[in-house]
C-alpha cells in the first residue's frame, strides 16, 4: 500500500463523513490473514509513534507517591496514590472505569508489585500495563512521547482498530500516520503486508473506505 493509495482513501473518508461539531477521530481498521492467532508470536502488541501526533490529547494516569506524584500533579496528569490504588483493587467497577478513561499508565517502579496485584487483571487484558519509571524520573519526555503514541493490540483476533489522528490533521499528515502504523505491522511478519487481508479508514461519523491499490 503506497502513500498515494492511502492518501486517496483518506480524502474519500473525509469527503464521505458528515460534518459534526466536534473533532472527529480518524481510525484505521486492519484485517489480517493466514496467521494463527492462538500462537502468541503472531499477535501484535506494539506502540506506534505517529509522525504527526494523535490530533488530540492522550489521557495519561500516573501511579506514584512523594515527589513523582507531585510532579505529575503539576503537569495536570491523573495521579493515583497508594491509598487509592489499594481501594481500586477492591472495586473492579472503578478500576475498569479508570482503565477505559486513560490511554496510557506510568507507575513508580517500586509500586509495580502492588499495581500488578490491584490493577493487573484490568489493565493487562487491555494492553495498558504501566510503563515503570524510577522515583526520581523526569516525566516530561515520556509524557511527550505518549502524546504522539497509539497502541496496536490484536490479542487473539485477526483484526484491530487504531486511532490514526483526527480530522484537524490534513490529508497528507493522516496518510503519513497510517503509513507509520502499516509499516509497524509489516515489520512484525516475515512476509510483511502480505498478511494484511484488507484495510479501511473512517471518520467517527462516516463510513469505512477501503485502502486499495
From Swiss-Prot:
Keyword vocabulary terms for this entry: Repressor, Ribonucleoprotein, Ribosomal protein, RNA-binding, rRNA-binding, Translation regulation, tRNA-binding
Statement: the UniProt record of this protein carries the keyword Repressor: yes
CDD domains: Ribosomal_L1 (cd00403)
GO cellular component, one term: large ribosomal subunit
InterPro entries: Ribosomal_uL1 (IPR002143), Ribosomal_uL1-like (IPR023674), Ribosomal_uL1/biogenesis (IPR028364), Ribosomal_uL1_3-a/b-sand (IPR016095), Ribosomal_uL1_arc (IPR023669), Ribosomal_uL1_CS (IPR023673)
Gene3D superfamilies noted in UniProt: 3.30.190.20, 3.40.50.790
BP term (GO), one: translation
One of the record's GO molecular function terms: rRNA binding
Similarity annotation: Belongs to the universal ribosomal protein uL1 family.
Binding partners and assembly: Part of the 50S ribosomal subunit.
Stored HAMAP family: Ribosomal_uL1_A (MF_01318_A)
Protein name (record): Large ribosomal subunit protein uL1
Gene behind the chain: rpl1
Amino acid at each position: 500500500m503506497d502513500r498515494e493509495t492511502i492518501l486517496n482513501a483518506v480524502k474519500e473518508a473525509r469527503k464521505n463523513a458528515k460534518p459534526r461539531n466536534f473533532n472527529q477521530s480518524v481510525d484505521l481498521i486492519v484485517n489480517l490473514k493466514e496467521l494463527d492467532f492462538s500462537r502468541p508470536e503472531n499477535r501484535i502488541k506494539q506502540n506506534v509513534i505517529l509522525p504527526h501526533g494523535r490530533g488530540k490529547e492522550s489521557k495519561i494516569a500516573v501511579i506514584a507517591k512523594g515527589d513523582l506524584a507531585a510532579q505529575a500533579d503539576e503537569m495536570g496528569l491523573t495521579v493515583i496514590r497508594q491509598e487509592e490504588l489499594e481501594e481500586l483493587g477492591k472495586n473492579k467497577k472503578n478500576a475498569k472505569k479508570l482503565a477505559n478513561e486513560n490511554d496510557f499508565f506510568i507507575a513508580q517502579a517500586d509500586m509495580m508489585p502492588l499495581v500488578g496485584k490491584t490493577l493487573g487483571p484490568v489493565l493487562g487484558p487491555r494492553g495498558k500495563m504501566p510503563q515503570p519509571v524510577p522515583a526520581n524520573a523526569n516525566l516530561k519526555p515520556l509524557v511527550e512521547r505518549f502524546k504522539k503514541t497509539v497502541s496496536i493490540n490484536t490479542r487473539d483476533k485477526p483484526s484491530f482498530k487504531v486511532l490514526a489522528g483526527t480530522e484537524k490533521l490534513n490529508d497528507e499528515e493522516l496518510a503519513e500516520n497510517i503509513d507509520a502504523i502499516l509499516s509497524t505491522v509489516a515489520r512484525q511478519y516475515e512476509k510483511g503486508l502480505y498478511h494484511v487481508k484488507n484495510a479501511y479508514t473512517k471518520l467517527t461519523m462516516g463510513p469505512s473506505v477501503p485502502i486499495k491499490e
